[in-house]
């Protein structure tokens, strides 16, 4: 049987998360709770304090949707995995709102059919998206960025900057886009860190 670690960044729905953690009994679970959700963090810490297979990130990040803070939270999870010195065949980044559709045996069989050691990462070219990389997004890390006024202001600022300001910091890089979710090997995680 393959050894699995499941990492997740969560912000809500403690009951759903408890169902998920129970369903993942065959692996270790690493949880990052959004820094804005102190009550959830304290509750989960208390619930899992005696569970040797559940680990919680203590140095948490205030996560804003589609902001770099999502990457920071993911890196903190990977650093926590590495710090335990537990070796896994695969590390899976999932949502706290997920539920597994496969058993441990089915998951192992699927991975083995694709080749143990392969990474499962969605990657797409960005040809239809490149124009957006030249624009600055002003409110990505603002916790209010989903409010209508901020969205309208962001759109207005983008339109104003279009003819005058072009972001240049990606020149020389071949960029791709994809999902946040992945399943990677331990060696791949070490390479990332």
Predicted regions and their residues:
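ER/Golgi luminal nucleotide-sugar-dependent glycosyltransferases, focusing on the catalytic module
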Residues: 1-193
């Amino acid at each position: 049987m393959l050894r699995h670690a499941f990492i997740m960044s969560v912000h809500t729905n403690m009951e759903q998360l408890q169902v998920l953690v129970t369903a993942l009994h065959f692996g270790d679970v690493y949880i990052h709770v959004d820094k804005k959700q102190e009550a959830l963090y304290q509750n989960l810490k208390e619930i899992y304090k005696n569970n040797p297979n559940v680990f919680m990130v203590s140095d948490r990040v205030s996560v804003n949707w589609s902001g770099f803070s999502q990457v920071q939270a993911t890196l903190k999870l990977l650093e926590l995995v590495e710090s335990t010195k537990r070796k896994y065949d695969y590390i899976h980044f999932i949502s706290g709102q997920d539920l597994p559709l496969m058993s441990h045996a089915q998951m192992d069989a699927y991975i083995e059919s694709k080749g143990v050691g392969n990474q499962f990462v969605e990657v797409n070219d960005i040809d239809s998206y490149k124009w957006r990389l030249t624009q600055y997004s002003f409110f990505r890390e603002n916790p209010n960025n989903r409010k209508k006024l901020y969205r309208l202001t962001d759109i207005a600022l983008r339109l104003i900057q279009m003819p005058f300001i072009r972001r240049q910091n990606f020149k020389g890089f071949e960029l791709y886009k994809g999902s946040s979710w992945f399943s990677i090997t331990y060696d791949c995680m070490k390479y990332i860190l």
